[in-house]
Amino acid sequence: MSKRKPQFDFWTIVTIGILAVFALFLIYPLISLFVDGFLEEGTGAFTMANFTKFFGKKFYYRSLLNSLKLTVCVTICSLLIGVPLAYIMSFFKIRGKSIIEILIIISMMSPNFIGAYSWILLLGRSGVVTQFLSNTFGIKMPSIYGFGGMLLVFTLKLYPFIYMYVSGALKKVDVAVCEAAESLGCNAIRKVFTVVMPLVTPTAIASALLVFMNCMADFGTPALIGEGYDVLPTKIYIEFVGESGGSAYFASAMASLMVVITAVLFLLQKWYVNKKSFTMSAMRPIQPTRAKGAKNVIMHVFTYLLVILSVVPHLVIIWTSLRKTEVQYFVDGYSFESYTKIFDTALSSIQNTVQYVL
């Protein structure tokens, strides 16, 4: 009996092509990263010295502990902001809801270091808000640099991930589930924690992992405002480009630790979601209701204040782009001079950016 020859149709070729690209641009770099972490500088021989050096000196392993501390705190703060915001926007009528959702999405549309730079302009040593409060009221603002500043910038930048994912999950919750809980005597708070939260917990954990990975791997924000608080990405960069004593193999070892930590958390998240996952189709989706009294005021203040803080970096960037400059300093007055310079000197960069996006 003759063996049947494999048939290569269009979709088989596409699948092979996708797998080849996946292997070339993802699997191969990761394997190279791990292999380089076990090589000795100069000889290329196998060694554990890179990891021994990292865990043997507080100067290095402290950056890993700092990264974990910052990332965990940012993830928790993002959950504490994003989940309540998603609940409020899904269950209650908030004035300007469509505009608020657009602004939340816009707040995600710039690199993290842009937000850090904007907050430096506001709350830095010579920031607008810092100088105003100091000169007018004699109030000394806490420093934007270090752990606190990074926690602020990362949280305001990354909580929209939580909000968007949890909002999507809440749209699949059938109102009959909430009505059943109310008929059994559950008050509003108990209904949230015993009915609503268990339904969206797998989604919240998945979005929290995205926040964790974004914060863990970010370099720009710690480089700008991480003064006195070393984290692993900046240590890796300094080690890789350092002109005095830097080692690409040692940098690879540190980077591989980040990959391992993220991979372990991803596997734990997948295990939990698979264990707790379920499918729900909302025959009657939740219809927002209008809150009354102080409750309504508090929810509006919370939502508006949060959105304002989220878009402040973008407003600051627009404001500073319109200010006049001489050499590299701001002077009184406003103009479109900066935009003119963009088309004279940076047009190719804009074209390249658009080209890469497309």
Set out the residue ranges of the language-model regions.
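Flexible interhelical linker loops that connect adjacent transmembrane helices
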Residues: 2, 272-302
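Membrane-water interface segments at the C-terminal ends of transmembrane alpha-helices
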Residues: 8-41, 56-171, 199-219, 224, ...
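Transmembrane helix boundary and interhelical loop/hinge segments in multi-pass membrane proteins
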Residues: 45-47, 166-179, 188, 216, ...
